[in-house]
Each structure stands twice: as C-alpha cells, then as structure tokens.
Amino acid sequence: MIDEKPPIGAEEVAEATAILQKYKAGKAALDKRLVDNELWFRMGHWKNYQNPMMEGKPQPASGWLFNSIANKHADAMDNYPAPNVLPRAADDAQTAQVLSSILPVVLEQADYEQVYSDTWWRKLKQGTGVKGVFWDPEARGGVGEIAIRPMNLLMLYWEPGVADIQASPHFFSLSMENTKQLENRWPQLKGRSASVLDVPRFLHDGGLDTTEKSVVVDWYYKKPDEAGRTLLHYCKFCNGVVLYASENDPALAGRGFYDHGKYPFVFDPLFMEEDSPAGFGYIDVMKECQTAIDRMNHAMDENVLLASKQRYVLSDTAGVNEEELADLSRDIVHVAGRLGDESFRPLQTAGLQGNSLSYRNSRIEELKEISGNRDMTQGGTAGGVTAASAIAALQEAGSKLSRDMLKSAYRAFARECYLIIDLMRQFYDEERVFRVIGPAGGREFVPFSGAALRARPMGLMGGVELGSREPVFDIVVSAEKKSTFSRLSQNETAKECYQLGFFAPQNADAALAALEIMDFEGIEKVRQRVRQNGTLAQKLTAAQMQIARFNEKLSGAEENLSTRALAKNLSGALRQLS
C-alpha cells in the first residue's frame, strides 16, 4: 500500500518560505527602524549614528527621550484594564455575569500584568504593541489553558500593503530556539541543523551568539473549505522540516486550527500609518530633537573642560621646560633666558554664552512639548500654583494624550478578550472551577465550562425548527488600577453624595432625579443603592402603619381579637418588611 502524500509537506514548506522571504523584503525598512529605535531607547544610538565631531571622544546621550517614554509607561500601568462582559440577549445575562468574574482570573493566571507591561514598552519604543492569544495544550499537566504572550514585532511578517493582519493570506511568527532542544523534541530534525533563514536581530553590547540556534517558523494561513467558510490553519516548521501541521491532523483538517478563524494576534499601534497594521512611536518623533540636544551637550561639555584647564601658547625660543610646566605638582618651572609676552602667554577659552544655554533649554522644552511630557504631568507647576486641587486639575488637563493612548489600548484589550472567550468556547470541554470575589467581597468558587458559550437549539415554533443560537457578548473596558487623582476624585464624589443625603431613604426620589442629570464612573451602582434604600423606606413605612393599626385595635377592642389572629397579622407585616 502506498502512503498518501500529506497535505503539508516539503514542497508546501518551500512555497511558504518563498512567501516569507517576499514578506521580509517588504518589511525591511520597518525592521531597520525597530533596531534603530531600540538603540535610541537604551541611549546607545551613537553606535549607529557616528558624529564626525565626536570621533575618538566621549559620546554623551541625555535621558530626556527615555524619561518621556518611562512616564508614559507609568501612565499605562496606572490604568490597568479590567473587562466587563455584557449580554446581547436576556438569556445570556447569567453567562455574561460569570464571564465578568472569571475573565480577570484567566488573565491573572496567564500573568497578564507582565504581558501588559512588556507590550506597552514595545508600543512606546517601536510604535506598535502586539499580543498573541493562544491555546497551550501542555499547560496544567496536559489539561490545557489559554496563554497570552507579548510578541516581538521584529519577528512577525504579513503581506505588505494590508492595514489589517486579518486581510493577509499568510502570517508568520518566527522565533530562535536551541537546535539540540528542538532535535530532542522532534527527532525528524536530526541532521537538518543548517538554518535556511536569516532574521533581523537587535544589537547587543556583548554580541549574541546564534550558532547553536535555529529559526522556528509558526505559519498561519487562511483557506476556504468546501462550504465556502474560511478556515485558519497552522503549520510549524524548522529548516524546511514540518514539525506540525493542522491540515495533516485528521481532527483539525476539516475544522481549522482555531474555530474563530482569526490570526491569534492583536496589534495596537500608537500612531497609525496608512496601509500597514504597524504604526510609529514617540522615538520616531523625538529623534531629531534628542540628537540636537546631545550635540549641544557634547559641545558644551568640551567648552567647560577647556575653560577649566589652563593652557599656554609657547614659542620654540621661549626656553621653558615643558615637562615641568605640564606637571602641576611642581612649584618651580625652570626657564632658559628671558620670557616675554610674545614667546609665552596663557591661552584663553571663551566661556559659555547665555544665549547658547537658552537655546539648548528651548530644544529641551520643544522635546517635552512634542512628547506631551510637560512638567505639569509629572507634578511640576508654574510659579504661583500651589493649591492641591489646582495642581491636580492641571495634571488632568495635561494628560489627554495619555487618555488617548489608553483608549486605543483598551480597544485592543477588548479584542483580546473576544479571542479568549472564543478559545473557552472551543477548548473548555471539562468543567473548571474559578475562585472569584463575590458581590459581598467574599470568596466564591464558580464552576464554568465551554458548554455555556456554545450554540444552543432554539426549539420549535409551529412545527418548524428555529435552529441554534450562539451566545454573543459585548465587552466594556474600565481601569482596574487607577491613578491617585482618579481615586481621590471618585472618593470625593462619594463623600459629596453622602453629605447631600443621597443615601437617606426618605430622599430617594430627589436623589434619583439628581442622578439622572449626573455622569460619573459607577453611577449605576449608586442608582441601584438609592432605589434599594427607597424601596426599603416604603416597606418600613407600610409596616409601621400596619403596626399602628394593630395598636389601635388592641387598645379599643382587645377582647374581640384572638391571640392567634394577632400573631398572624404581625408575621405578615414582618414578611412585608423583609
């Protein structure tokens, strides 16, 4: 019997490698910019940009650019996102509530805070942050779990000219791995250790030895099936050898690698560029200004050193012992003959001019203005502003650029949550238990499986099957960790509502009327609490009136009311109160 040729073999891998090389050529300019920006961030950019003025001399690199980026990263970490899942149909309300409580647990188990931080560094440095949302079948002892990883944009490739990676027919994710470890895991790689691909790398001070490493390619591609549905398939290969291919897997050949049919990568550009999913960042904008500042710093440093060191103009006929003159420890310098101003004189170096310092400071202010990293955003204030509320207001007004960046990050976070829910739907076959924080603040253990997310039959109507419906959700993102100003503002709002009597049961109607024209975060919880207080007040008033009627009856005609009837009426009043 002749073995059938697998759908993905050496020929298909060779074709994919040719496509990858074409994608690499179209991304070469971006790769060069990424490597360059990394040097700028590490303040080692003079390694690539040698200044003729600085050959053989110290190459100063001030940290204004780094400080700006570090402050923006701090803003991002102050506003760590939290998901809130909303149902689109009333039948899915319970599932949405459970998802809202377990999604933060899934993110925590995936070490999402570290992923969020690393991605923000790359977003600010490179202009684009990329996260990968995968299913790791080896996690939890083979049970499997969702994995979220920060991706290196330098090792990702897509079709040139597309603005959305989902429109690319192929997508490649590359990684460098130890060849011996690869051979131990995949024996078919033995004897095929010669790497056939070259990848761009960041520059390192000590160099990076890659002689014992091979390039592993994760190849994602979209392919229509017989019914016209677009399936996502996946192939991992190294040095021309197929390590795994979903089309070669009978369980996935007709289904696709992931049911959602999307590339499992989420791009979050800082400043968008046309016809590219990748954007540009603050380093690209601030390079020129930082270069000018560095050059001025170098010239000023040289001037200060020259001005602080005494030098002389010495004629050949002066007869001065140069060795003794240069030795500052000697108190006496011998001279042969007579010295005159024409043969020996000090060399004066002009000091720094005030306009030079002003110009350098103006370039520093320009860099701050370009990056939106003005003094007020870091707590500094102009003269005369001393009130804490005024300083906080200035900080909030100056942080609109940070809020704009956070909104784009929250949109990307919502797309990541949709991918997580899709992976739950596909792979959470067994019921799992999650420890969550309940509404009362205590621990609760919530069971959950993918069955709650899968399509359910709609039943019959008039003898006709209505088919099935898959639950669909909307995700609203809010900040889990807030800045100090946001927390103080929220606390002040709560105190004002309390002082104005919003939570007094007798003021429920007036408080609800005021809340209708107010807008602040968490207003729905406040409305719910005010309504509960109003309902409780109504029940309490009704119970008090009924008890008053009982007292009248008891005082007027005690002999006509049996003890059993009195107890029955009192118990009914207590039930109404509860």
What do the predicted segments below correspond to?
Residues M1-G254, G351, N355, Y359-S362:
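Extended, helix-rich architectural segments
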